[in-house]
């Protein structure tokens, strides 16, 4: 059995889909369906069972027998960079992850988990997986940063692979439930279909991010699991593109009105990453040599999915 926490979410459900594609169906999805919209991400997938995240971690703490587990992909977390409830964030992202990590260590189960490019904070270069380059700007980034530090201390004692992925700007199918935290592609497409002009923040031609298609993210996860890799790795393409470039692709796809620019929100000043670009040297060094989907192809693929479901 393979366990995917956050398996009804964006990246989690795409990992389940990738596992299905290589023949795995004995999959336990762990998630929180309090907001039920995420169920649509599971409808076309083959899984063995579903458990609520709180019930599942209670079973883990009680040392209940959960069966023969081949791996745990831990995607379950609060991923909102706008959430400032530190107690909630640390309990949900940090403490939950530690409990699951120790369960895997004791049972010698490969543990693959979601970190984030948010650990790098406001820097504009050297996005390298080393402590000296890490300085998060928000409590979400700090929760991921702190767990990465915890993992680094654990590695010398680990008898099974522990692999963390620092996701940059992931976009693609199955993110509808994320609302305001969904990708810019999703929001621009939604605005245009509603008959509204697509909107970007003023200065978006200068705001650049490393955008990676979700299928590429899923493939990196599976490859690292299959090759028993341990480490913390950037999960981006190594190339930055502006939000303006992204918007131009969406506008051209729809042949829509030009972009309308809005003032940059006051509440984001000082806690917003204006530039990210993954250094993927470490990922390539371990042998991952697959190409990444070019941005224009990925955006077009995603728009086709959004408009022809």
Swiss-Prot record:
Keyword annotations of the record: Carbohydrate metabolism, Isomerase, NADP
GO BP term (any one): ADP-L-glycero-beta-D-manno-heptose biosynthetic process
GO molecular function: ADP-glyceromanno-heptose 6-epimerase activity; NADP binding
Cofactor: NADP(+)
Keyword Ligase: no
InterPro entries: Epimerase_deHydtase (IPR001509), Heptose_epim (IPR011912), NAD(P)-bd_dom_sf (IPR036291)
Function: Catalyzes the interconversion between ADP-D-glycero-beta-D-manno-heptose and ADP-L-glycero-beta-D-manno-heptose via an epimerization at carbon 6 of the heptose.
NCBIfam families in UniProt: heptose_epim, PRK11150.1
Free-text note on domains in this protein's UniProt record: Contains a large N-terminal NADP-binding domain, and a smaller C-terminal substrate-binding domain.
Subunit structure, as described in the record: Homopentamer.
Family the UniProt entry places it in: Belongs to the NAD(P)-dependent epimerase/dehydratase family. HldD subfamily.
This protein's name: ADP-L-glycero-D-manno-heptose-6-epimerase
Organism, scientific name: Hamiltonella defensa subsp. Acyrthosiphon pisum (strain 5AT)
Lineage of producing organism: Bacteria, Pseudomonadati, Pseudomonadota, Gammaproteobacteria, Enterobacterales
């Amino acid at each position: 059995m393979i366990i995917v926490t956050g398996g009804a979410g964006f990246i989690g459900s795409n990992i389940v889909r990738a596992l299905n594609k290589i023949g795995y169906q004995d999959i336990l999805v762990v998630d929180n369906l309090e907001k039920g919209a995420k169920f649509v991400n599971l409808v076309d997938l083959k899984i063995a069972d579903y458990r609520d995240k709180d019930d599942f971690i209670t079973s883990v703490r009680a040392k209940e027998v959960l069966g023969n587990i081949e791996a745990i992909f831990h995607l379950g977390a609060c991923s909102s960079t706008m959430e400032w409830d530190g107690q909630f964030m640390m309990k949900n992202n940090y403490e939950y992850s530690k409990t699951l990590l120790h369960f895997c260590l004791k049972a010698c189960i490969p543990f693959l988990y979601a970190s984030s490019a948010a650990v790098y904070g406001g820097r504009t270069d050297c996005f390298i997986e080393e402590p000296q380059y890490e300085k998060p700007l928000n409590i979400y980034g700090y929760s991921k940063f702190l767990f990465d530090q915890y993992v680094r201390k654990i590695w010398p004692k680990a008898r099974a692979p522990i692999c963390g992925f620092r996701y940059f700007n992931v976009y693609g199918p199955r993110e509808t439930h994320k609302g305001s935290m969904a990708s810019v592609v999703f929001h621009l497409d939604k605005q245009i279909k509603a008959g509204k002009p697509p909107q970007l923040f003023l200065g978006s031609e200068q705001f650049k991010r490393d955008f990676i298609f979700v299928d590429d993210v899923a493939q990196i996860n599976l490859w690292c699991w299959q090759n028993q890799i341990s480490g913390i790795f950037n999960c981006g393409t190594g190339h930055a593109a502006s939000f303006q470039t992204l918007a131009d692709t969406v506008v051209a796809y729809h042949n829509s009105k030009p972009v309308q620019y809005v003032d940059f929100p006051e509440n984001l000043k000082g806690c917003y990453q204006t530039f990210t670009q993954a250094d993927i040297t470490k990922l390539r060094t371990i042998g991952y040599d697959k190409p990444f989907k070019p941005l224009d192809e990925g955006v077009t693929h995603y728009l086709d999915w959004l408009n022809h479901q």
